[in-house]
C-alpha cells in the first residue's frame, strides 16, 4: 500500500488553511519569528503607539518581560495586558490576544521553522495568532501510529520549545486519518489528554481535512483558545475543553441569551460536568443583561467539593456561603456576578429575607443546578421558582429521570427543566476514552429458594437480613475481597469502595474484616463512614443513635491508629473530608484499601485512583450507574476499566440501567468483553510475538531496527492483554492456561527493557536518529507497582546486621529483585542500592541505623556526581546545583541559568554542554528523589 508522505500531507494542509483565511508567511528561524511578531505588534497598537513603532530597546525590554517564563505563566501573559515603559518614560499597555472579538485577531501560518538551540528541530506547521505561535501541528504519514507523533511533540516540547514557542497553547497531532488536540503544559502531558474533535451529535471528526475545515477555522481556533481553555489556578495547568463540553456551553448560552426557556444538559457521570457548568456560569455572568448567575448544589459535602473545583478553574471566583445571612449579603451585592450555594440555603434566604431580594424579582437571573436529578425534585425548587419571576433554570445531570426511574413525585427531568439541550452518553464517553468501560463480575453467595436475589423481596415471609447478613456469608465475602483485592487493584495501586445495604450491614462487615485480618500476612486497610441521627440526614437506613455513634467512634479511632489522625464523632466532618482526600489522592503506602459505605461517596465523588466497587445491596437505574461510575475515571494505561464485583444478582438491573442511560440495546458498548474473548486475543498476539522472536534470547543477536520495532510492538500488545486478563478470576499465568508462563513473560520483558534502555539517550550523548526514538514503550503497563523504591528500602531496613549468613541471603534476595526491576525510578537507583548493600551493609554493626547510613551514603554519592560532572563539563558546580534545585521544584530547566552556566564556550561546544547538563539535571533529580 502506498501512503501519502508527510510532505504531501503538510503541503495539502497549508493550502487548505490558506483557503480558510490564513495568511501564509515564510518563517524559517527564530529571528524571523521575532521580526514578524514585532511587526504585527506595532500594527495592532498603532494608535496606542501614536504612530511610533517600538524601538529596538523597547522591543528588547518587552521580550525580557515575556520570555523565559513557564507555559502556564506565558498563557496568563497571553490573556493579559502588558505595561511597557517607552524610551520617553511614557507607559503603554500592549495586548497579545483579543479574547472577546475572536475574528479580529491576525491569523498566519508557516511551516518548517528551524530552532537551533540545545537540540536541533524543525516544526511541521505553526499557526500564528498576532505573530505568536499559539498552535503547533505535528504530522506523520498515514499508517504511522499517532502515538509516535505524540512522543515526538513531547520530545520537542521538552528540548526545543523556548522563547516565543513557550506561548503554544495547543498541539494538533495527526497522521491524516486520526487527528487529535491537546493542551500544552509545563509538567508531564499524558496521552489520555489528547482529545478528538466532534460535531454537536458527538460524531468524531477524525481526518485532518475535516478537522482543518472545522476546528482550525481562524475564528474557531481563536474562540477555542480564548473561551474554551481554562487556566487551572490550583494546579497551574492549562486545560482544553472537550468538544461535547464546548457544544453544551454553546447550546446553553444560546438558550439563555436568545430565549426565555429553561433546559438541561445530559452528560454522563465522569465526563467533567463541573468544568462544563463552571464555564457556562462564567460566560453567562459576563453577559450585560444577566444580573446574577447562581450555581446551586444539593448537599453540604458536595458544596465544598464543587467550590474547590470552581476555585481551581478561577481562583477566588467563589465566596463560601457559610450561612444564610452571608448568602443574602452576597445576593444583595450586585458586584458579585456568580454565587455558589446550596438550594437549601437559597430556599431559607427567600423564605426569611424575601424583601431583601425584591431587586431581582423582575431581573434576569440564571440558576445553574449541578446534578439536578438529586436536587430539583421537591418543595425547595418550587419556592425558589416562585420568587424569581424572570429567572431561567438550567440543570446538569449524568442520570436524568425518565418514566422508568421517575422521582418520588412522579416527575421526570424534562417535566421540570424542559428540553434537553445537549447529550453526551456513557457509550459516547467510553468510545472517546473519556471514561472507562466496566468489567462486571457476579459472585453467587447464597442458594435459597425463599428470596429473590434481584429485588431482596420475601417469598415466604422469611427475614432477608438473616440471609444476607448471616455470619457465614459476611465472612465469606470479606475473605473473598481480601484474597482477590490485590488482583483487582493491581497490587493495591488502586483503592476500592464496598457499598452495603444499611448501617448494621456496614458495621457487621467492618467487624468481619477486623476479625479475619490476623489470618493474612498483608491484611487490607479498611475504613468505614456513616452518619448517626445527630448528623445531617444522609438516607443511610434506620439505626439506634447511641449504638451507631458508639460504633462510629470505634471505627474513627481505628482510622486514627492506621493513619496518624485525631478525629472523633465530634469532628465528623473533618473525618469525612480526610477520608475523601485519602481515597481521592491515593496517598502512597498509607492509603485506604477498602472504604465501606451505605450511600456516601456513591454520587458526586471523583477519584482516578479508585478502580473497584464491591456491591452487596440492591441497585437499579440511576443509583446503579452513579455507583458503578465511581470506578471509571481515566487515569493511565494500568487502569483499563472500572471493576465491579457484585455479591448479588444484579445482571438484569445492570442491563436495564445501561440500556436506559446509553439509549441503546447494545450494552456491549459499555461493558468489557468476557475472559474468553480476551484470552483468544492474547493467543493471537502471542503467536505474533513468537513469529518475531520464538524465544526471548533470539533478540540478543538482532541489530536491525525494524526487527526491534516489530518486537516492541508485538510484546507491548501481549503486555496490555496480560494486564486485562489478570483482572479476571479465571486467569492463571501458566502455559497450560494461556500458552505462556510468568517466567517466560519476564524473560521477554527483560529484552523489551534492554531495547528501551538502548533507545533512551545517555547523559551527554548526541541523540541518534532512530525509528525507535518516538515509539511508545508504555512502560507503565509493565510495572510491578509493589516492587518499587519504597518496597526495596523496606527490605534493606530489614537486613540482619547480626547474623552474617542471613544477611547474605537478604542481600542476594534484594540483588535478584534489582536485576529484574521494572520501576523506572528503581532502575535509576539500582546501581546505587547495589553498591550500598554490597559495600556499606557488611561494614555496619548491630547498633548502626540502616536508614541513617543510607542517607549519608546517598548524600555522599550525590555530592560526588555533581563534583565529577562539573569537572568533566568545566562548569560551575554551585550554579549546577542551583539549576537542579529549581528543576526539582518546578520541573523546568531554567534556560537563563543554563546560558549562564555554559558561559563563553564555542557554539557547538555550548550546545553539547547544554544538552549534557539538561540530561544530568533530569537524571540526578529522579535518581536522588526521596
Curated annotation (Swiss-Prot):
Tagged with keyword Chaperone:
no
Organism's domain of life? Bacteria
Known catalysed reaction(s)?
Answer: Endonucleolytic cleavage of DNA to give random double-stranded fragments with terminal 5'-phosphates, ATP is simultaneously hydrolyzed
Protein EC = 3.1.21.3
Q: Which UniProt keywords apply?
A: ATP-binding, DNA-binding, Endonuclease, Hydrolase, Nuclease, Nucleotide-binding, Restriction system
Q: Where does the record place the Helicase ATP-binding domain?
A: 254-418
Binding residues for ATP:
268-274
UniProt-listed CDD domains? DEXHc_RE_I_HsdR, HsdR_N, SF2_C_EcoR124I-like
User: InterPro entries under this entry?
Assistant: Helicase_ATP-bd (IPR014001), HsdR_RecA-like_helicase_dom_2 (IPR055180), P-loop_NTPase (IPR027417), Restrct_endonuc_type1_HsdR_N (IPR007409), Restrct_endonuc_typeI_HsdR (IPR004473), SWI2_SNF2 (IPR040980), Type-I_R_enzyme_R_subunit (IPR051268), TypeI_RM_Rsu_C (IPR022625)
Is-annotated flag, keyword Plastid?
no
An individual GO BP term: DNA restriction-modification system
GO MF terms held by the record: ATP binding; DNA binding; type I site-specific deoxyribonuclease activity
Give the protein's biological function: The restriction (R) subunit of a type I restriction enzyme that recognizes an undetermined sequence and cleaves a random distance away. Subunit R is required for both nuclease and ATPase activities, but not for modification. After locating a non-methylated recognition site, the enzyme complex serves as a molecular motor that translocates DNA in an ATP-dependent manner until a collision occurs that triggers cleavage.
Q: Family membership, please give it.
A: Belongs to the HsdR family.
Give the multimer and partner information. Answer: The type I restriction/modification system is composed of three polypeptides R, M and S.
| More details | Type I restriction and modification enzymes are complex, multifunctional systems which require ATP, S-adenosyl methionine and magnesium as cofactors and, in addition to their endonucleolytic and methylase activities, are potent DNA-dependent ATPases.
What is the name of this protein? Type I restriction enzyme SsaAORF53P endonuclease subunit
What is the species listed in this Swiss-Prot or TrEMBL entry?
Answer: Staphylococcus saprophyticus subsp. saprophyticus (strain ATCC 15305 / DSM 20229 / NCIMB 8711 / NCTC 7292 / S-41)
| Gene from which the chain derives | hsdR
Amino acid at each position: 500500500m502506498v501512503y501519502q508522505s508527510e510532505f504531501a500531507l503538510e503541503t495539502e494542509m497549508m493550502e487548505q488553511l490558506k483557503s480558510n483565511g490564513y495568511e501564509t508567511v515564510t518563517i524559517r528561524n527564530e529571528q524571523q519569528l521575532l521580526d514578524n511578531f514585532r511587526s504585527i505588534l506595532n500594527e495592532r497598537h498603532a494608535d496606542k503607539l501614536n504612530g511610533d513603532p517600538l524601538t529596538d530597546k523597547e522591543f528588547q525590554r518587552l521580550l525580557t518581560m515575556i520570555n523565559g517564563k513557564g507555559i502556564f505563566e506565558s498563557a496568563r501573559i497571553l490573556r493579559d495586558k502588558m505595561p511597557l515603559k517607552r524610551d520617553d518614560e511614557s507607559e503603554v499597555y500592549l495586548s497579545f490576544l483579543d479574547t472577546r472579538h475572536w475574528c479580529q485577531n491576525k491569523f498566519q501560518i508557516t511551516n518548517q521553522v528551524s530552532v537551533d538551540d540545545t537540540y536541533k528541530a524543525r516544526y511541521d506547521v505553526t499557526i500564528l495568532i498576532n505573530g505568536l505561535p499559539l498552535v503547533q501541528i505535528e504530522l506523520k504519514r498515514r499508517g504511522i501510529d499517532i502515538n509516535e507523533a505524540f512522543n515526538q511533540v513531547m520530545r520537542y516540547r521538552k528540548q526545543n520549545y523556548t522563547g516565543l514557542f513557550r506561548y503554544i497553547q495547543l498541539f494538533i497531532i495527526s497522521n491524516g486519518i486520526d487527528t487529535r488536540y491537546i493542551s500544552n503544559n509545563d509538567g508531564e502531558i499524558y496521552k489520555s489528554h489528547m482529545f478528538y474533535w466532534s460535531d454537536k451529535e458527538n460524531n468524531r471528526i477524525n481526518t485532518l481535512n475535516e478537522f482543518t475545515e472545522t476546528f482550525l477555522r481562524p475564528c474557531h481556533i481563536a474562540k477555542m483558545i480564548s473561551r474554551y481553555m481554562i487556566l487551572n489556578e490550583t494546579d497551574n495547568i492549562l486545560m482544553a475543553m472537550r468538544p461535547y463540553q464546548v457544544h453544551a456551553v454553546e447550546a446553553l448560552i444560546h438558550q439563555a441569551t436568545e430565549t426565555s426557556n429553561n433546559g438541561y444538559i445530559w452528560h454522563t457521570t465522569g465526563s467533567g460536568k463541573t468544568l462544563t457548568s463552571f464555564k457556562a456560569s462564567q460566560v453567562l455572568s459576563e453577559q450585560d443583561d444577566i444580573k446574577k448567575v447562581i450555581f446551586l448544589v444539593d448537599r453540604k459535602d458536595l458544596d465544598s467539593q464543587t467550590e474547590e473545583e470552581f476555585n481551581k478553574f478561577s481562583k477566588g471566583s467563589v465566596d463560601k456561603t457559610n450561612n444564610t445571612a452571608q448568602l443574602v449579603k452576597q445576593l444583595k451585592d450586585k458586584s458579585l456576578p456568580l454565587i455558589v450555594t446550596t438550594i437549601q440555603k437559597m430556599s431559607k434566604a427567600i423564605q426569611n429575607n424575601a424583601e431583601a431580594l425584591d431587586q431581582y424579582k423582575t431581573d434576569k437571573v440564571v440558576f445553574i443546578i449541578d446534578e439536578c436529578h438529586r436536587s430539583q425534585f421537591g418543595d425547595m425548587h418550587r419556592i425558589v421558582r416562585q420568587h424569581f419571576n424572570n429567572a431561567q433554570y438550567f440543570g446538569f445531570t449524568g442520570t436524568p429521570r425518565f418514566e422508568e426511574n421517575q422521582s418520588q413525585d412522579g416527575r421526570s427531568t424534562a417535566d421540570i427543566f424542559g428540553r434537553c439541550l445537549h447529550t453526551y452518553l456513557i457509550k459516547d464517553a467510553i468510545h472517546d476514552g473519556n471514561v472507562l468501560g466496566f468489567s462486571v463480575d457476579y459472585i453467587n453467595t447464597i442458594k435459597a429458594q425463599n428470596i429473590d436475589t434481584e429485588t431482596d423481596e420475601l417469598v415466604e415471609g422469611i427475614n432477608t437480613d438473616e440471609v444476607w447478613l448471616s455470619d457465614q456469608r459476611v465472612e465469606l465475602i470479606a475473605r473473598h475481597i481480601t484474597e482477590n483485592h490485590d488482583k483487582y487493584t493491581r497490587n493495591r495501586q488502586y483503592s476500592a469502595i464496598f457499598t452495603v445495604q444499611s448501617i448494621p450491614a456496614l458495621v457487621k462487615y467492618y467487624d468481619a474484616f477486623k476479625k479475619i485480618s490476623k489470618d493474612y500476612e498483608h491484611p487490607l486497610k479498611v475504613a468505614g463512614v456513616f452518619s448517626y441521627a445527630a448528623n445531617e440526614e444522609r438516607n443511610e437506613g434506620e439505626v439506634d443513635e447511641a449504638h451507631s455513634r458508639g460504633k462510629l467512634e470505634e471505627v474513627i479511632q481505628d482510622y486514627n491508629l492506621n493513619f496518624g489522625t485525631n478525629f472523633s464523632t465530634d469532628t465528623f466532618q473533618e473525618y469525612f473530608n480526610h477520608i475523601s482526600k485519602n481515597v481521592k489522592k491515593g496517598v502512597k503506602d498509607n492509603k485506604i484499601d477498602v472504604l465501606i459505605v451505605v450511600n456516601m461517596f456513591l454520587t458526586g465523588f471523583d477519584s482516578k485512583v479508585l478502580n473497584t466497587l464491591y456491591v452487596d445491596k440492591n441497585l437499579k437505574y440511576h443509583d446503579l450507574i452513579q455507583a458503578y461510575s465511581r470506578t471509571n475515571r481515566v487515569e493511565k494505561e494500568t487502569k483499563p476499566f472500572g471493576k465491579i464485583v457484585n455479591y448479588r444478582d444484579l445482571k438484569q438491573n445492570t442491563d436495564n440501567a445501561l440500556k436506559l442511560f446509553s439509549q441503546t440495546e447494545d450494552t456491549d458498548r459499555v461493558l468489557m468483553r468476557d475472559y474468553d474473548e480476551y484470552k483468544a486475543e492474547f493467543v493471537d498476539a502471542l503467536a505474533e510475538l513468537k513469529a518475531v522472536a520464538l524465544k526471548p534470547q533470539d533478540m540478543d543477536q538482532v541489530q536491525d531496527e525494524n526487527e526491534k520495532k516489530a518486537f516492541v510492538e508485538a510484546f507491548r500488545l501481549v503486555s496490555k492483554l496480560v494486564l486485562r486478563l489478570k483482572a479476571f478470576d479465571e486467569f492463571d499465568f501458566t502455559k497450560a492456561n494461556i500458552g505462556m508462563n510468568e517466567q517466560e513473560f519476564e524473560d521477554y520483558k527483560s529484552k523489551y527493557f534492554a531495547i528501551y534502555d538502548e533507545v533512551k539517550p545517555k547523559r551527554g550523548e548526541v541523540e541518534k536518529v532512530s525509528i525507535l526514538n518516538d515509539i511508545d514503550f508504555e512502560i507503565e503497563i509493565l510495572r510491578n507497582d509493589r516492587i518499587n523504591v519504597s518496597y526495596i528500602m523496606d527490605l534493606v531496613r530489614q537486613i540482619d546486621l547480626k547474623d552474617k549468613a542471613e544477611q547474605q541471603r537478604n542481600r542476594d534476595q534484594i540483588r535478584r529483585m534489582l536485576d529484574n526491576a521494572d520501576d523506572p525510578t528503581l532502575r535509576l537507583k539500582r546501581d546505587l542500592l547495589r553498591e550500598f548493600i554490597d559495600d556499606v551493609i557488611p561494614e555496619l554493626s548491630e547498633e548502626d541505623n540502616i536508614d541513617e547510613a543510607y542517607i549519608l551514603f546517598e548524600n555522599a554519592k550525590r555530592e560526588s556526581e555533581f563534583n565529577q560532572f562539573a569537572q568533566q563539563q568545566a562548569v560551575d558546580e554551585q550554579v549546577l546545583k542551583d539549576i537542579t534545585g529549581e528543576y526539582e521544584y518546578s520541573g523546568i530547566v531554567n534556560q537563563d541559568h543554563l546560558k549562564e552556566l555554559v558561559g563563553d564556550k564555542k557554539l557547538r561546544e555550548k550546545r553539547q554542554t547544554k544538552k549534557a547538563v539538561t540530561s544530568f539535571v533530569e537524571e540526578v533529580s529522579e535518581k536522588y528523589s526521596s
